[in-house]
């Protein structure tokens, strides 16, 4: 195993815990950016170009018949082939959190339609499900099993907001483990069926799942109800005859206690588990090898990588599987330095790499026609993410040109900012105050100076006043700047004075010219 530090030369502020990586024919693509996509890359999907230990995020485009794909954190992803012999594969994306902390229940299918030297074109389609549709969730897993020449998606675990009937003002943003049901999803016809298995008693999230042929292994995970990381190991086998599918579960010994671990495949029947947590505030520094042979699973410890001091002393870490036995890891930067990075990134190679190190992309070294092992890399968001978002997600690189000058900086206009010295709005404890609020606080724009956003609740605004200000075009000043605004009296409008026209210095004559004959006639007339 080799650990190498890499530098992200652009768009480093977009990488955050909960992102996902997709590997298409050796090319790695980044998905799940921080904030909503901007005009530089409206798709939110980037090509992760690695060259000489430098990483560049290159924008990709969608085809005209594609649907919109929001940036999702902690979704369930897996590869999908029509059959085991098929060479082309697609990625299935289900659930996840949007930048507004809304949990998605949609399922998307990603495939590549065109590749050239400059940009990659994806086709993204939304799949509608009928039947026992899984509720919106995140931190779960989805895998594909193959049996009797047919394929089926298997979805399990995750967390979601409490049902609307159980949500109270004090616990409006509280989450709970989803019921321990196993969902079978037919991607061809869009049918979903749920199964209740007696062996699965408690809900799990941020677990590791491995799929091979008709079998899925689930190990580790975190139970929110009991606040434990059980060392369970489940084997779920799916049989797909002509009639109804048969699903059975077996509890196996030899599991490990870990959550938010990353799984990567090193060869046909061997996988490596990296990272994760064994306690709420303790990282799991050891790695394990998982071998799948003859319908058996074997878990054993392996040589620990030479972790750097920064990784050892970091409270959190996160990452995703790049494919080909390589893991992309990130840790928070050092906030004590004057100029600090938001995150530091590393590449951990768990498999022997015989390819040239100067190669720009990773080549797929898998020779098996079976579906590669699927895992969903996660980070315990309730335990680590929200604390990291407050001080670590605003890191920016000096070469980062992603944020255009004419667009607002989301780190300054977010809903969870400290709007004033007395602001007490916290993402973990906030509850709706106005009837118009649902899952984020109402805000109003202060027109003082360059302007800034404040929480309406912190300004003690009545709901009627808030609605009136939101509907009108009147300027609003927050409690801190209202006295300054009152002191700046605008002078009353004065009508301009009518200036009399300037008189000519010489008095003009009548304009009549008397000839000498007329003068003589007038002289004789009056005489």
Curated annotation (Swiss-Prot):
InterPro entries: Gal_Oxase/kelch_b-propeller, Kelch-typ_b-propeller, RAG2, RAG2_PHD, Znf_FYVE_PHD. Signal peptide: none annotated. Keywords: Chromatin regulator, Disease variant, DNA recombination, Metal-binding, Nucleus, SCID, Zinc, Zinc-finger. Cells of the B- and T-lymphocyte lineages. The gene is RAG2. It comes from Homo sapiens (Human). One of its GO terms (molecular function) is phosphatidylinositol-3,4-bisphosphate binding. Zn(2+) 2 binds at residues 446, 452, 478, 481. Core component of the RAG complex, a multiprotein complex that mediates the DNA cleavage phase during V(D)J recombination. V(D)J recombination assembles a diverse repertoire of immunoglobulin and T-cell receptor genes in developing B and T-lymphocytes through rearrangement of different V (variable), in some cases D (diversity), and J (joining) gene segments. GO terms for cellular component: DNA recombinase complex; nucleoplasm. A zinc finger (PHD-type) spans 416-484. Coiled coil: none annotated. The keyword Zinc applies. Belongs to the RAG2 family. This is V(D)J recombination-activating protein 2.
């Amino acid at each position: 195993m080799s650990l190498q530090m890499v530098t992200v030369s652009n768009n480093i502020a977009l990488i955050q815990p909960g992102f996902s990586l997709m590997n298409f024919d050796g090319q790695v693509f980044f998905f799940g950016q921080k904030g909503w996509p901007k005009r530089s890359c409206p798709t939110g999907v980037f090509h992760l170009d690695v060259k000489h230990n430098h990483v560049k995020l290159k924008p990709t485009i969608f085809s005209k018949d594609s649907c919109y794909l929001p940036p999702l954190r902690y979704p369930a992803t897996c590869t999908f082939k029509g059959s085991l012999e098929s060479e082309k594969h697609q990625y299935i994306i289900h659930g996840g959190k949007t930048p507004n902390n809304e949990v998605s229940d949609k399922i998307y299918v990603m495939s590549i339609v065109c590749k050239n030297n400059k940009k990659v074109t994806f086709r993204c389609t939304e799949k509608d499900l009928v039947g026992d549709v899984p509720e919106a969730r995140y931190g779960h897993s989805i895998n594909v099993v193959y049996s009797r020449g047919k394929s089926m998606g298997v979805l399990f675990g995750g967390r979601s907001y409490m049902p609307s009937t159980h949500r109270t003002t004090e616990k409006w943003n509280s989450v709970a483990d989803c019921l321990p049901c196993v969902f079978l999803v037919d991607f061809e016809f869009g049918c979903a069926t749920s199964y209740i298995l007696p062996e699965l008693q408690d809900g799990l999230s941020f677990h590791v799942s491995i799929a091979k042929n008709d079998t899925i292994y689930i190990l580790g995970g975190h139970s929110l109800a009991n606040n434990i990381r059980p060392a369970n190991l489940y084997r779920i086998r799916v049989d797909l005859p002509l009639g109804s599918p048969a699903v059975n579960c077996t509890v196996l010994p030899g599991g490990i206690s870990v959550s938010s671990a990353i799984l990567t495949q090193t060869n046909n029947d061997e996988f490596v588990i990296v990272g994760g947590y064994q306690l709420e505030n303790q990282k799991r520094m050891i790695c394990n090898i998982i071998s799948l042979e003859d319908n058996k699973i074997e878990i054993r410890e392996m040589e620990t990588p030479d972790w750097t001091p920064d990784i050892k002393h970091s409270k959190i870490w996160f990452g995703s599987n790049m494919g080909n036995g390589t893991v992309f890891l990130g840790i928070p930067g050092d906030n004590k330095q004057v100029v600090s990075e938001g995150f530091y990134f590393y590449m951990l190679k768990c498999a022997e790499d015989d390819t040239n190190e100067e190669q720009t992309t990773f080549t797929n070294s898998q020779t098996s026609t079976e579906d590669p092992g699927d895992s969903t890399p996660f980070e315990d968001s309730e335990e680590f993410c929200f604390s990291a978002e407050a001080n670590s997600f605003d890191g920016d690189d000096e070469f980062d040109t992603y944020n255009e000058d004419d667009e607002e900086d989301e780190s300054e206009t977010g809903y969870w900012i400290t709007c004033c010295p007395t602001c007490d709005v916290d993402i973990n404890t906030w509850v709706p105050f106005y009837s118009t609020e649902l899952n984020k606080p109402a805000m109003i724009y202060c027109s003082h100076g360059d302007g800034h956003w404040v929480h309406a609740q912190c300004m003690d605004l009545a709901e009627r006043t808030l609605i009136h200000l939101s509907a009108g075009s009147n300027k609003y000043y927050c409690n801190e700047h209202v006295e300054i605004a009152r002191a700046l009296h605008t002078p009353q409008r004065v009508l301009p004075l009518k200036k009399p026209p300037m008189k000519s210095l010489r008095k003009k004559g009548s304009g009549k010219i008397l000839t000498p004959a007329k003068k003589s006639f007038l002289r004789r007339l009056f005489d």
